[in-house]
Every structure is written in structure tokens, then in C-alpha cells.
């Protein structure tokens, strides 16, 4: 696999030099300074690409070209934003970039309640606490009909949790959930957040699927024509939250996805940390069944806690994910492609990482500190080497 690394551009505290020293060769990045929906111009793409190449690296994957909210709700100028998206893809292809990761999650990108959860060894991880999230919905946001989402036991627990929160706790939880995370292109106030949620109040999962299908049928033929692989990222966490529809969460969703738009350019980002939160998701089966449509891999593990809807991000080779067999399945697919004459390796990045060692004293992007990801990348490099020697005679 191609060893890649997510970089948030010139303002990222982890530099391109740091990344090269970590052993990665591919960069996963985006033009974060361009507003959602606007066209990425060729000059801006070339400028970023040149910056990366001058550091001895290559721009391997775009993560992400954001999908404008009006595309997701099919309101306002959604057709304009779709046309802009097509032009951005054409411009990327003209600059030699061939893989685009994106998501179709409404309102929020990935969601956590704690961005600095301390583990027994003193390292810090990202965590999603189901009861804390319920307290936010029920008592801070006060989302209409939120009580229908939670059973009586959960509502009582959420009330107790909220009653024990200080004003500082409330402000911190609110910021963690709605203020935007690295890679999320939107940040909201509480009122703005509810306004965004209200845009989806009449959009069921079934209707939302028709919106995704429309987007796919507009975009994927263009991607197919120009040689770009589209790799949709799953919902994170992979279940409905905040009353919003979530439609890229299970193996059934993946099957619907490829049947809806069967062109080969229509594929997946296999994010083990997102899909793996659900105990009913068999990640090895998902990887094997859709191997020929996996164009990008985020390798990360999570650990479900006593409440199975609560989880924290585990060390990369620990937790609930069968990483050994997932990586083995990815290598099987990679060798199948190579045997058929393809030369492109599957780009893989260590997704997130614990905040450890010297990074505990630094300001870092949540989940994207340097040393935790360096550790994860080294572990995956070793796992890949061992698998190749034992199973692939390489």
C-alpha cells in the first residue's frame, strides 16, 4: 500500500518535512481556504501540488472536495454547486490527481464528545460518549423531539449527566460537537446549528438516498471520463444522530451504493474506525466484498465501552477492529490489481492517533498529532511487511 499522511496545508503544525521523516510518501490534503462549493482553480491546485512535490512528496489523495449542504438537501443553488464540483474534478484531473475522498454526512463531519480523553497510560484519545451526547441534545441544544431518540433509562442518565456539568463543561461539550473539527468545513453557533438541522426535518433516509443518487449520477460519469476515482467516506459514527439521516453506515448501504451507480469510478474509502464502531459491521467481509471498489483506506481502531454506543479511539492495532485480516484483504486486492497491470497502490493513511509523548505539551489538531500517527504508520508498515512475507512471498 502507498503510505500516506493527512496534511492540513501550510498552517498545519505538522510540516511536510515532518511527514517525510515519518516515512510517508503520499500526501492527503485539500484546498481548505476555498469556500465550500466554489471551484478549485488550476493555479491554486498547481500551487499546492508544487509545494508538496518540492518537499519530496506527492499529492496522492484529495480529502475532501466538500459536498455543499444545498446539494445534500437539494435546495437553493444545488445544481450550480454540482456543476462547480464537476469543474473542480476536471481541474484536479488536469493536474494529475486521480483520487478524491468525500462524504455525504449532513451538517456535521465526524462527531466526538471528548477531544482529549485520557487513557490509563496518560495518552489522550478522541471519544464519543453516548450519554454525554444525549445530554447535549436533550438539555443544551434542546432539539425538538430529541426525547424520541432515547429510552427512559438513557434520558434519566442524560439528565443526571447534565445536572453534574459546570458552565465550563457545557461550553466545552458544545464546542466539541458543533464548532467544527479538522476536515469539517463548517463551524456553527448553537442557534445556527439548530437552523442547519431544521433543513433536514422533512428529509427521511429514503429521500436522502435519492439526493445522494442524483449527486452520484451527475458526478461519477464525469469522474469516469477523466480518470478520477471517487471514494465516499462512511458516516462517523455510523448511525443516525441529531435526527439526521445517515446512509453510508453498513454493508447494506455499500451494496445500495454500487448498485445505484455501477460505474467503476464510484467507490469507497474503507475507514475502519468509522465502520468499526458498529458491532454488526463485519469489516473483513466488507473489505473483501467491495475490494475492487476500495480506492483509499483509513486505518484506525475503536474500542466499544460498557455502553456499546460509547466508544473511544484505540491504538491502531488494538481495539475492536480485526486489523490483521482487514490489511490482508487490502493486500489481496492490491496484488490482484497489480497482476492485471495496474500500477497504482492503494493509498493508506494511519487515521488519527493518540496524543503522546512530546505532543502532549503541544497544540495539535484533535486526532492529528504527529507522534501518534507516526507510531501507527510504523505499525502498519511492519504489519504489511509481515503479511507480504508470510502470505504473498514478497
Swiss-Prot record:
Catalysed reactions listed for this entry: D-mannonate = 2-dehydro-3-deoxy-D-gluconate + H2O
Pathway: Carbohydrate metabolism; pentose and glucuronate interconversion
Gene Ontology MF annotations: ferrous iron binding; manganese ion binding; mannonate dehydratase activity
GO BP term (any one): D-glucuronate catabolic process
InterPro entries: Man_deHydtase, Xyl_isomerase-like_sf
Cofactor(s), by name: Fe(2+); Mn(2+)
EC number(s) on file: 4.2.1.8
Alphabetic keyword roster: Iron, Lyase, Manganese
SUPFAM superfamilies: Xylose isomerase-like (SSF51658)
Top-rank EC class of the record's enzyme: lyase
Family: Belongs to the mannonate dehydratase family.
Task performed by this protein: Catalyzes the dehydration of D-mannonate.
Protein name: Mannonate dehydratase
Gene that this sequence comes from: uxuA
